[in-house]
Design a protein with these regions (language model features):
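N-terminal hydrophobic segments of proteins, predominantly signal-anchor/transmembrane helices
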Residues: 18-27, 39-124, 153-164, 519
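Transmembrane alpha-helices of multi-pass inner-membrane enzymes
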Residues: 38-48, 244-245, 258, 493-496, ...
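Membrane-interface helix-loop-helix junctions at transmembrane boundaries of multi-pass membrane enzymes
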Residues: 2-12, 48-96, 202-218, 251-262, ...
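Hydrophobic core segments of transmembrane alpha-helices in multi-pass, intramembrane catalytic enzymes
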Residues: 33-44, 120-133, 186-202, 235-247, ...
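Membrane-interface catalytic loops of GT-C/OST-like multi-pass glycosylation enzymes that act
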Residues: 30, 116-121, 143, 174-186, ...
């Protein structure tokens, strides 16, 4: 093997290794993710170095000359190779337009006053520029290599989800979202949603796939769906269902087979009707309240102590009134025998434990006295200590508890105007703040670095009841772009995402289209591009699917 051939193999191997590192560590570590980015960067530069000039310099001339000029000559070759790469890049119009969003962020410095945050934001957004650059100017992968990368992506997520599930069942988590410590649970949900469609491709679409691979793909699909439920990933489940529905619509119109059309229509009907009936039944259960004859309420407990009945307070938990049949002295005494947390203290979520106890007992239909407390198991006591206030939330394989939480947050907001503690109502408050900012800065936006500042000012102006430690940004990427760069910036953002895919016929490719639907819908409820993991996930797979492979996989 010649030196030149060995060099080429080394550079290509480093490039492949960098891609593999990014795929593996996207859900794990932003630091090692950065190593993957730097590995690709190094390989991209070395690939374009003039090897003859490089070796010629070190094989000719005096030793003194080599030592004196080694560093500047090497740097010169690197800069020349970078220039070669950019010249190729500038001839690739779709890749340039995709990466142009980074230029928009640079231009946003004109209107910013917080340059410290702006520069930090530019570092975070670097993948917007470098990933389209690298993939569009490097040798594309063949179909088999592409499939191997996709298998690595899916199997890696299997490991991540199994590890998270093990942690969930073996450690105490106040917030279930904390099981995903290294990447946002929302970004992880998007990755899993995409992996579901990758596994689905090997199950249904890919030809010459062995029965064993199809069986493994089916098991993985079932497992990912279970994980999305037990991890309460509404975003992951939501974008999966929406993407599946859109694909079914596309297949209905594109297919020439009457049986496939019928199957798609039936599947869509099942999704809509089944999902609607399931949601309707949960909402009806939530608002179904026990019938109580207030004139016949018992006055004392079995131990002879007087009950407190607050019949004016209509609060319920799982259909049972909270403030009837309450005997505080018996609860205080009984709780002190069952728990180390003082009755007047707070649970692990920071809520008054006595009220968590009241809600939990009510959710089981028990009276709030010594008798009701005695019926609780040790597992019930542990749940109350963790801040779980409804027995419905103990069932990890059901979405009922999560939907109850959303409905409770909605009712609390209607009665108090305070969205704190409800993810749904907080998002509505974020969007309300966003609309206020957009109304004032719709033309050119506030710039790259002033987002946090203008949101803080807007929340004060609104006199919001949202807790100040949760005065967050819009949780809607379209709003974020509009606030940062104005209406023309939003238009360019959409062009930068749609035009390259249109020109490269990405919308005719199964992998790109499913990914595109997933991320575009996710942008409605999340600032996906505001974190390193999110922007890396978005632009890595966009660039990889569109520029990084030779053959597309048709729908």
């Amino acid at each position: 093997m010649t030196f030149e051939r060995g060099y080429q193999i080394f550079v290509r191997t480093a490039y492949i290794a960098g891609i593999a590192i990014i795929i593996v560590f996207l859900p794990f570590s932003k630091y090692i993710l950065s190593i993957g980015m730097w590995t690709i960067t190094g390989a991209w530069i070395l690939e374009r170095v003039n090897l003859k000039k490089f070796t010629g310099f070190y094989t000719h001339g005096s030793l003194f000359r080599k030592i004196l000029l080694a560093l500047p000559y090497t740097l010169m070759l690197w800069f020349v190779s970078i220039g070669k790469g950019f010249r190729v890049f500038f001839r690739n119009k779709p890749a340039m337009i995709l990466a142009s969003l980074y230029v928009l962020h640079i231009l946003g410095l004109i209107f910013t006053s917080d340059f410290g945050y702006a520069l930090k934001d530019l570092r975070t957004k670097a993948p917007i520029l470098i990933l389209p650059l690298y993939f569009s100017t490097s040798k594309a992968f063949g179909r088999n290599d592409f499939y191997r990368f996709m298998m690595i992506f899916v199997l890696n997520l299997v490991i991540v989800t199994l590890a998270n599930t093990w942690k969930l069942f073996n450690f105490e988590f106040i917030d279930i979202r904390d099981i995903s410590r290294h990447v946002s649970h929302i970004i992880l949900g998007l990755m899993i949603s995409m992996a579901l469609f990758v596994a689905g491709y090997f199950l249904v679409r890919k030809k010459r796939t062995s029965v064993w691979i199809k069986l493994v793909a089916l098991v993985i699909i079932v497992w990912f769906l279970i994980y999305l439920v037990i991890s309460r990933s509404f975003t992951g489940l939501g974008v999966f269902i929406v993407t599946l529905f859109v694909l079914l619509v596309i297949y209905t119109f594109r297919s020439r087979s009457i049986w496939l059309k019928a199957g798609c229509v039936l599947s869509m009907a099942l999704l809509l009707v089944g999902g609607g009936l399931y949601l309707r039944s949960i909402v009806r259960d939530y608002y179904r309240v026990e019938t109580v004859d207030y004139s016949k309420l018992e006055k004392v407990s079995p131990l002879g102590n007087p009950y407190t009945h607050n019949i004016q307070n209509k609060q319920t938990e799982n259909g049972h009134y909270l403030w009837i049949y309450v005997q505080w002295d018996e609860l205080r005494e009984g709780w002190s025998k069952r728990s180390r947390i003082p009755f007047d203290s707070t649970d692990l979520k920071g809520q008054p434990v006595q009220f968590t106890l009241i809600r939990y007992l009510s959710s089981k239909g028990y009276r709030k006295d010594a008798g009701g407390l005695e019926k609780l198991t040790d597992e019930d006591i542990e749940a109350i200590e963790r801040g779980i206030a409804d027995v419905v939330n103990l069932n990890r394989l059901s979405l009922k508890g999560r939907i109850y939480e959303l409905l409770m947050g909605y009712e609390k907001y209607l009665s108090t105007g305070d969205p704190t503690g409800s993810s749904l109502m907080q998002r509505l408050e974020f969007w309300r703040a966003s609309r206020g900012i957009i109304a004032e800065h719709w033309l050119v936006g506030v710039g790259t670095g002033d987002m946090n500042q203008v949101f803080t000012e807007q929340y004060r102006k609104m006199k919001t009841k949202l807790a100040s430690d949760q005065w967050w940004r819009s949780h809607n990427q379209y709003f974020s772009i509009l606030i940062g760069f104005g209406i023309f910036g939003l238009a360019w953002f959409l062009i930068s995402l749609i035009y390259p895919a249109y020109v490269k016929r990405g919308f005719e490719d199964y992998f790109f289209l499913t990914f595109f639907i997933i991320v575009m819908f996710s942008l409605l409820t999340e600032d996906t591009l505001e974190s390193q993991a999110g922007v890396s996930f978005f632009y890595f797979f966009y660039s990889f699917f569109l520029f990084g492979r030779r053959e597309h996989d048709p729908l």
